[in-house]
């Protein structure tokens, strides 16, 4: 089947790129550290089948695109679940970021440190973003008056924060400036996880027909991605040059972003790719609270845990302590 790709879609060049791909894995964003597992799996040959990994940023109908292309994708848990509720025929089968990467940043000099400090302040965010919903859920969980917070759309950049246009911003943890930068300004960070908000961050999903017709392919892709994440974090001296060749990021910036997201991919005592039902229930509840959709498709139909269980059962070495070590 010939795929009609958007102009900005680009694939990673691999030795098998000229051969017909068994499936395509689309990334909801540009190549970068947050897709290090997928990039590593492709570049290091961890996929048994020929899987083409493609960056597919800025597609407002990303989940629908995956369903239409009979493909595999990775996007935010929020974006996936809302599309599933709208009837897009897709199923999530594993986690990339086991928790949200959303954080709230303030200048250290402001003295703002806790969620309660944000009452009466200006908070910048990106319109229709995951961060906006997670922030509201955190404030509601803490019983803080959201009506007393001035939220400014499209002011969610670190430039806006440093310029004093806002008192805090909602952004992804891996987007923060590198402390080694000469112009770096010290920041305070609030993580929603520290206040009981745990939701799936990035998730892997596929069209329902691909999952039903080719389950062994999904299992192969998942195993390859797990090995890819292990490679990314086992030794930066090996992985960063490989990843830099695909992402175009400076090596130090790439290493910094990998460090920032490490706990989201490799949680203490957890397994790469694993997620639990409680995180999905929390995400469902906060989306309903935000009135962003109706649960027309129950979680039991939108999410499967079987692929993760099967992969680790068949290859227990993937979860062994020696499978990945502390970053070097």
Give the label of every model feature segment:
Residues 1-22, 318-328:
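Short, low-complexity disordered leader/linker segments with a strong preference
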Residues 42-43, 84, 140, 181, ...:
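Short polybasic/polar patches that bind polyanions
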Residues 52-55, 256-262, 297-309:
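Short linear loop/turn motifs
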Residues 214-293:
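Secondary-structure end/capping motifs
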Residues 288-328:
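Conserved C-terminal helix/tail region of periplasmic/extracytoplasmic solute-binding proteins
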């Amino acid at each position: 089947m010939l795929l009609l790709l958007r102009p900005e879609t680009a694939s990673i060049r691999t030795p098998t790129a000229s051969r017909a791909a068994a499936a395509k894995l689309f990334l909801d964003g540009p190549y970068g550290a947050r897709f290090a597992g997928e990039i590593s799996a492709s570049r290091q040959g961890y996929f048994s089948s020929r899987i083409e990994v493609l960056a597919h940023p800025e597609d407002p109908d990303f989940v629908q695109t995956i369903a239409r292309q009979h493909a595999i994708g990775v996007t935010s848990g929020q974006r996936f679940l809302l599309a599933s509720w709208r009837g897009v025929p897709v199923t999530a089968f594993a986690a990339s970021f086991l928790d949200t990467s959303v954080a709230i940043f303030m200048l250290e000099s402001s003295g703002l440190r806790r969620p309660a400090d944000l009452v009466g302040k200006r908070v910048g965010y990106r319109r229709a973003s995951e961060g906006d919903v997670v922030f509201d859920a955190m404030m509601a969980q803490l019983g803080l008056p959201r009506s007393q917070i001035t939220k400014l759309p499209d002011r969610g950049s670190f430039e806006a924060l440093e310029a004093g246009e806002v008192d805090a911003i909602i952004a992804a943890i891996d987007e923060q400036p590198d402390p080694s930068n000469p112009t770096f300004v010290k920041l305070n960070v609030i993580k929603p996880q520290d206040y009981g908000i745990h939701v799936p961050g990035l998730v892997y999903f596929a069209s329902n027909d691909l999952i039903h017709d080719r389950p062994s392919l999904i299992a192969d892709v998942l195993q390859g991605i797990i090995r890819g994440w292990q490679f990314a974090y086992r030794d930066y001296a090996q992985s960063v040059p490989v990843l830099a060749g695909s992402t175009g990021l400076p090596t130090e910036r790439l290493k910094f972003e990998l460090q920032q997201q490490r706990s989201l991919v490799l949680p203490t005592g957890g397994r790469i790719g694993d997620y639990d039902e409680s995180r999905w229930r929390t995400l469902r509840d906060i989306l309903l609270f935000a009135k962003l959709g109706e649960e027309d498709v129950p979680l039991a139909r939108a999410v499967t845990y079987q692929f993760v269980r099967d992969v680790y059962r068949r290859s227990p070495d993937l979860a062994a302590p020696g499978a990945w070590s502390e970053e070097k």
